[in-house]
């Protein structure tokens, strides 16, 4: 009997609660963060129309100019920004070059001429205030190396392999890592005199400074024969990547005079090296 009265006494309370409005959810304060990318030092022609902003692994494709994000106040944020670069993928602020499409002896050989990569990283440990701003200084992360050989015979095609090349770079620190073979196709052009010029182009994230940087060039000649050129470029690459300008190296020896290797390389428009 007591149990029955207790049950009946609950009915009015349940009915009354069902008519009450639920409380509004608590909303955390927000900060409007304005992000600006600083392209100082980057040639106008190299500046892309769009790039990627990554905030705590949330990725946005944005255009140049100021971009505003509504973020939770009093939170920490890891922010990276980088350009789209062919044959380069970026995960957890690590940029990595894809594997070579040309089959060589090393199964882990990388593409020696990926797209040009610019990027940067910043961190906000405690975002405060109704509004805030952050400027991201974009840095050039790839560097060009061009090796040229004078050509007095006809070449149909070719490719080259450079040892001791970095396969990745950390956007947080700017430090490159890895030591792989990089593979690139040879470029054959005709100059104003009607002569062929052979250029071996590389675009690299960096070099393994402890490795020997041997360049091997494989050429298919028009007469059906082939030629392999092996040379050590280590001494010429000791300061590679310290400036944004390309490093251009040329040989003063004609192709027909090269038996197996080249010793008298000259650095062109990038400093002076005594040979």
Kindly label every feature range from the protein language model.
Residues 185-189, 201-202, 260-275:
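Short, low-complexity, Pro/Ser/Thr/Gly-rich segments in the mature regions of secreted, periplasmic
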